[in-house]
């Protein structure tokens, strides 16, 4: 299934020095977002920075949203994750996509201009309406949480 999403290029290096976001394989769920920096930047352990991507999107369809998710290799190998853990992009947002990057590792990390730093995933949205009740119909799980269903 393919859905058209409006994309605005805000940095002329996209499409010349750096490719447009694209799916790497037919089974890919996310498209890589790149750090559109003018120079390398070093994040000390514990540092958080906001990194421009040079792109803006307008999803338009209220049945869709975008999420910005971490790249697994950066997190596992270098401790580089998203400062807000997940970025949620509403369908009516039209500003630049920015990535909050946090170095939760023990070593400094130098990010290079054009480096792939996160991935963009388009997802369906269900808007719920609440029905006020005095009691819930009993479920098997009930109020159990935080490991109550076991480990195996």
UniProtKB/Swiss-Prot annotation:
Enzyme Commission designation: 3.6.1.23
EC top class named in words: hydrolase
Functional description taken from the UniProt entry: This enzyme is involved in nucleotide metabolism: it produces dUMP, the immediate precursor of thymidine nucleotides and it decreases the intracellular concentration of dUTP so that uracil cannot be incorporated into DNA.
Pathway it works in: Pyrimidine metabolism; dUMP biosynthesis; dUMP from dCTP (dUTP route): step 2/2
Gene3D superfamilies: 2.70.40.10
GO biological process, one term: dUTP catabolic process
Pfam families on file: dUTPase
GO function terms (MF aspect): dUTP diphosphatase activity; magnesium ion binding
Similarity comment: family membership: Belongs to the dUTPase family.
Binding site for substrate: 71-73, 84, 88-90, 98
Reported cofactor(s): Mg(2+)
Keywords recorded for this protein, A-Z: Hydrolase, Magnesium, Metal-binding, Nucleotide metabolism
Catalytic reaction equation(s): dUTP + H2O = dUMP + diphosphate + H(+)
Protein name: Deoxyuridine 5'-triphosphate nucleotidohydrolase
Gene: dut
